[in-house]
UniProtKB/Swiss-Prot annotation:
Protein name: Serine--tRNA ligase
GO MF entry, a single one: serine-tRNA ligase activity
SUPFAM superfamilies in the record: Class II aaRS and biotin synthetases, tRNA-binding arm
The protein's enzyme class: ligase
Keyword ATP-binding in record: yes
Pfam families, alphabetized: Seryl_tRNA_N, tRNA-synt_2b
Functional description taken from the UniProt entry: Catalyzes the attachment of serine to tRNA(Ser). Is also able to aminoacylate tRNA(Sec) with serine, to form the misacylated tRNA L-seryl-tRNA(Sec), which will be further converted into selenocysteinyl-tRNA(Sec).
Amino acid sequence: MIDLKLLEKDFENVSKRLKLKGVDENNLEEIKKLFKEKKEIKTTLDKLLEQRNILSKQIGNFMKNGEKDKAEEIKKEVNSLKEEISVLEEKLKTIEDSLLQKALVIPNIPDEDVPIGKDEDENVEIKRVGEIPTFDFEPKPHDELGEKLDWLDFTRGVKLAKSRFTVMKKDAARLERALINFFLDHNREWGFEEVYVPFMVNRETMTGTGQLPKFEEDLFKIENEELYLIPTAEVPLTNLFRDEIITNLDEPIKLTAYTPCFRKEAGSYGKDTKGIIRQHQFDKVELVAITKPEDSDKMFDEMVACASNALEKLGLPYRQLMLCTGDLGFSAAKTIDLEVWIPSQNKYREISSVSNTRDFQARRAKIRYKDGKKNKLVHTLNGSSLAVGRTLVAIMENYQTKDGNIQIPEALKKYL
């Protein structure tokens, strides 16, 4: 959640940064109006409280001097003040609650070094790694390869569920499992502790990482239950520490988990309708880190390097992109995307996003750490290492042969 104290103190500059992420100016003006009302009420309230305290002391003095009549008169004034104070306190609480609700749907402030831009077309390429493969034949898309090899059964996926669900068979199923184990082992080598988490979480957990209340339409909710299927392991991993004070954070907490992920993909109608690039259910191995504020930049670089190294081990060509302000996610202050080469599309496609949310999620989820005698907000980071289904797509397309078979990357052979 955005720091409301910072927004109130430096409204013009902060709102200017927020507009770069597409925040509606009317919403910001409503918040500004509430800040003004809050300030006016607090000023009046402070005066009334001061007046009440002065009168209360006078009552004590009159009672000591035996002047009960005068004391009773002032008591009436104090009681009248109490009623005014009670009304104002209720108004103040209403305004503060309203500010809190509005803050829950305001995104994080982008870092100063994030490039300014409206959408993905203005993201900035950092570097490319690996050679794009050349074929002496027309490379086939993964869905065509998958059906020919009887690896991917789209028809039965629809029969069992609906569109954007797929049945994986034979070597596709084995490769999916191999990739999960490979990614978990790889992340552990980079110092991330493996965790197994619930695939369903409650509303407070979804709110803690920023999925609720703004993105409810993209979540699968369990009917008659306050439970949601997770869209990413970032949600349960980060919220492990919700409402907690971490006593020792001298070293960052580094976690990794495999989970299936569930997304309605609202707003994706007509995009990636073929194959398994965009599914309602997909596997992902996630990285999450919790750090002191001064350690989060270093951890961000480490997480980008970890995910990048996984692609390099698999021999997959990729590029790194710094996302511009208009393409940043809701909770992110800064994001680097990794995009892997997809031959049939003749372009790079996202396979990982690594984000530093600074103290945005920590403020929502109340995750703090001990710094001497003070409790301070942590920084939280997350990133895919990696999206399993999209890695399978990249392997199928980059490692395909002229006869329609798929070669296996050396790094995966021991897992098969």
